[in-house]
């Protein structure tokens, strides 16, 4: 009795099957990711030039002539309060250079927030800048939420998470594993036809910038609502219980000190409650009140602690505190090792707590260091590099669309999905990769499961859909 054996696939056949399996997932991920990649790169370009755009738009209320004598900040504050008696001053930001005006963030009764600019040499109010109308605010809101709130944030997180799949699959497709890929590795074949040219440009540019793209994806995901806010940021939030002891805490968090979509507080402090001032009228305790303690004394103490460029948040209510912060998240400084946040009792002037770089977790330190790179704040060369990266990401996205356009089935209602080659065992390799990424990035995992369900329940069972997705 003879035994029938199933021939084992050759190594070349297995590589071919794995190649097309990877290409299919690269294609599907790209369908979702490319529009978001273009949006993120374009809004990122606007945000990179925020300072230049703002100074051009509001030159008359920002540019001043430096003088020898600077007026006390308390006098500048008084001028703002006199000019806008019904408004509440919430923040003071000293100018980063002597030929620019200081800023006071002012909350008006209609809920709008504006910067009131003041000449620090004369304490004269120069004008206002509507914070909600800045190009940065507009671009940052699109960059983070698509202007639709949490659902926009979730969609961007899905795109960034699937971007990891796009990146991993793209690297595999680019590596010179077989002769076909070796022929175009690290070279662009101009005379071999349009499809080869665009493929080489797309693959080599994406492959060479893969680590840069991974950096932008991971650092960007750290701000996202699920992976960032619920997982990574929560794990790295500053441990106030053990460090701040029994000091009273409010329900106000550091994130509440941000303005709009602007991130002004350190990433690892955003979910941490802000300490409270000891109200001098308490029933069980009397705290020494310093009637002379105000913004000038806050700044003097901040300077004594080592603050250079910073911002001051004013107390909110009777138990509020003065918060002085200098961090890379807000762009106050570029060296993450100088990150520092301090809270002062508004009555006694006592330093309630101080958090510095040394207190950060390893991931929080990585975020503080990475944010300057992400925002192009380190130097003019960092900004130029980020501009080139944004343009490269746009080119990678466009070349991907061009590649699809050139190989799409013309005259047919078909998407042009890369072909499938069935082979026992190969699908497990792809599935393991997808599972690892899906577990590491929950929204990517949920999207993959949804895609598989739609494929199994609808696409594979409805003839027209099956043809369209082929």
Annotated model-derived regions:
Residues 1-470:
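Conserved histidines in hydrophobic membrane contexts and catalytic metal-binding motifs
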